[in-house]
Amino acid sequence: MKKAVILFNLGGPDSLNAVRPFLFNLFYDRRIINLPNPFRFLLAKFISAKRENTARKIYEEIGGKSPILENTKMQANASELKLNENRNHVHKVFICMRYWRPFADEVIESVKQFDPDEVILLPLYPQYSTTTTLSSIENWQKNAKRYGLKCNTKMIHRYYDNQDFIEAHTNLIAKYYKLARKIGKPRVLFSAHSLPLSIIKKGDPYASQVERSVELIVEKLAINNLDWSICYQSKIGPVKWLEPSTESELLRAKADGVPVVLSPISFVSEHSETLVELDIEYKAIIKDGYYFRVPTLSTDPLFIKCLADLCINLP
């Protein structure tokens, strides 16, 4: 049996000229801004124009483009190798980005050429949110219908409590905790992408799933009297978002004079929000030598095993 696995990710501009259209696509998503047209279109145009210069400066810090596609390609290659250890089926992994290339319509044409017996949708979002997982799935389904991809399709919605996912995080955090311990008693900050409270109040389970991921990791770390906190980054705009902010927790750690071990708990690949926000902007808050940023899971063997097993064990 031939199986196509579709890895969903956010996407990112592949040049500085792509920054504004990328931002427009992001803010035009009705799962991000829930307004009817033409209001959503006009607001997306306004926000993307207003934020373009700020965003361009961010991408200039990391070579003029987002590394998310290259990172996702490495994850796709590693996952495909792992999946094809199972000789009963032939797996091919495709990358589908939500807000920049490759878009769903391009990927669907490639999938049709592969002609699979089954399609598996696998978001690179461990914790489910309507703004990420659901948005990607709905966009895929709409394009699959439009471009005539008729195939048995299965979906993976979440894996925030997957044993291998938890263990992969635990191992990385333990390594950096040991380094930080040489300075003093570290505080572990679990930094997740923030969401507006209005979305959470509508029943989005993202925050509760982030909390459960962290609970399981803390339990697995089994460090006596571990000092830890969940915090949220990347807020934009004036509305209320999930709190506390990562910045405020770093300022608190600075005031307390403790080393910080920061784990990007909701990110599985490196991009602007880790490489610039965490590694440059937030790092500058903490005293030199007191900041230990844990890498994203990327192609960690346990994480790749997690992704492969999710596909293999689907009913």
Curated annotation (Swiss-Prot):
Q: Where does Fe cation bind?
A: 193, 273
**Catalytic activities:** heme b + 2 H(+) = protoporphyrin IX + Fe(2+)
User: Does Metal-binding appear among the keywords?
Assistant: yes
Query: In which compartments does the protein localize?
Result: Cytoplasm
Q: Which GO terms describe its biological process?
A: heme biosynthetic process
Enzyme class, spelled out = lyase
Pfam families per the UniProt record, alphabetical: Ferrochelatase
**Lineage: superkingdom:** Bacteria
State what protein this is by name: Ferrochelatase
Q: To which species is this protein native?
A: Wolbachia pipientis wMel
What gene is this protein a product of? hemH
